[in-house]
Curated annotation (Swiss-Prot):
Segments forming domain HD: 73-217
HAMAP family hit by this protein: dGTPase_type2
Disulfide bonding pattern of the chain: none
GO molecular function, one term: triphosphoric monoester hydrolase activity
Official protein name in the record: Deoxyguanosinetriphosphate triphosphohydrolase-like protein
Keyword tags: Hydrolase
Keyword Hydrolase: yes
Keyword Hydrolase attributed: yes
Length: 402
């Protein structure tokens, strides 16, 4: 690809980039910092939050007990932020905003990955459901208790809208999932602070969203190979990974399997990043946005895979779902994790006094929906390890996740 027009940290910000000097501000007004932009302050608040530290002990596919080298939500988040920042720099966007959205995007995930989310959503169906993106919003607007003047982190409008809409509009003609109901916590907050749910998020948020796809597509392969759930031979069945493996084997015919896997992963990240940059440049040239408002008003995302890469990526995802996420050994752990969280929900909902004092306080005055949301907030904030410990404390038998 050509490096013409690529930003490397010294080029002027593009006219369609978010300008921190023109931020729409915060829900609770605050004095500006003399040393940091609003987006830098958002990033720093996210990094110093309790929710960020908890990501260290929350897993994605592999349960934490399996080993120290598998990715957690924290390591995944750092990898997403690195890719998002690289994309933003190349497209001459605000790197700090892209990084902030990337760093906060997984705050609302439960223990035990998507299994935990499914378990909580099952128990919360009668009370508005549970959605990790909506939970991320609750954390940064309500559940973090660090500041004297407000609950949450009081992030800028741009970071909040990027968090909520990084995968596309939630309502209207261009909604990413038009048949899906918007989670109640998002609708409730939107009444207080309009995040323009029918419009596309900033290019910085779009960079964070696609960086998430790039990161987990590659790194789940890395973890799957390490765990022995995937093999290089099996990856030869996937067009994208076969092409990359052929390149590696041609250049390094005697390379051992472990390094071959690493070479595959790094090449996959590189080729996807380069594809996104090239496709984004093509879409930007066609759309000719001259402002952030022009970006918001588009009918489609401007940061995206090319048609060819999107097809390859879908095939890869189908392969990973079949061979990794629903591998027999992973499914066994998923069932165990599911039972742990559902047991904890049922017990805490029936008897809130078993929760820590700050969570049980005032539960006796709450209606069922509010009490269920309180329990879901408590459980969603747990790490994998803490959820297992609590289950062992409360029950005679805890499913084995090892």
């Amino acid at each position: 690809m050509s490096l013409e027009g690529i930003g490397f940290g010294y080029r002027e910000r593009a006219p369609y980039a978010c300008d921190p000097a023109r931020s729409r501000g915060r829900l609770v007004p605050e004095p500006e910092s003399p040393t940091r932009t609003p987006f830098q302050r958002d990033r720093d608040r996210i990094i110093h939050s309790t929710a960020f530290r908890r990501l260290k002990h929350k897993t994605q596919v592999f349960i934490a007990h399996e080993g120290d080298h598998y990715r957690t939500r924290l390591t995944h988040t750092i990898e997403v932020a690195q890719i998002a920042r690289a994309l933003a720099r190349a497209l001459r966007l605000d790197e700090d905003l892209a990084e902030a959205v990337a760093l906060v995007h997984d705050f609302g995930h439960t223990p035990f990955g998507h299994t935990g989310e499914e378990a909580l959503n099952d128990r919360m169906k009668a009370f508005g459901g549970f959605d990790h993106n909506a939970q991320s919003l609750r954390i940064v607007t309500k559940l973090e208790h660090r500041y004297a003047d407000f609950d949450g982190l009081n992030l800028s409008w741009e970071t909040l809208e990027g968090l909520v809409k990084h995968n596309g509009p939630l309502l209207g003609a261009h909604a990413a999932h038009p048949d899906a109901a918007v989670p109640l916590p998002i609708l409730d907050f939107n009444e207080r602070y309009d995040l323009e749910l029918t419009r596309f998020a900033s290019l910085e948020a779009q960079c964070a969203a696609i960086a998430d796809d790039i990161a987990y597509n590659a790194h789940d392969i890395d973890d799957g190979l390490r765990a022995g759930l995937l093999s290089l031979d099996a990856l030869d069945e996937v067009p994208l990974t076969k092409r990359l493996l052929d390149l590696v084997r041609t250049r390094y015919p005697d390379l051992d399997p472990v390094r071959t896997g690493h070479e595959l992963v790094r090449r996959q990240i590189t080729i996807m990043v380069e594809d996104v940059i090239e496709e984004a440049q093509r879409r930007l040239a066609a759309a000719k946005p001259q402002s952030v408002e022009d970006v918001h008003g588009q009918s489609h995302a401007l940061v995206a895979f090319s048609d060819t890469m999107r097809t390859d990526e879908k095939v890869l995802k189908r392969f990973l779902f079949k061979n990794l996420y629903f591998h027999d050994s992973v499914v066994v752990r998923r069932h165990a994790a599911d039972k742990i969280l559902q047991d904890l929900f049922d017990t805490c909902f029936a008897n809130p006094s078993i929760m820590p004092s700050e969570w049980q306080s005032g539960c006796e005055t709450l209606d069922e929906a509010a009490r269920a949301r309180r329990v879901a907030d408590y459980l969603a904030g747990m790490t994998d390890n803490y959820a297992v410990r609590e289950h062992r404390r409360l029950f005679d038998h805890t499913p084995d996740l090892a």
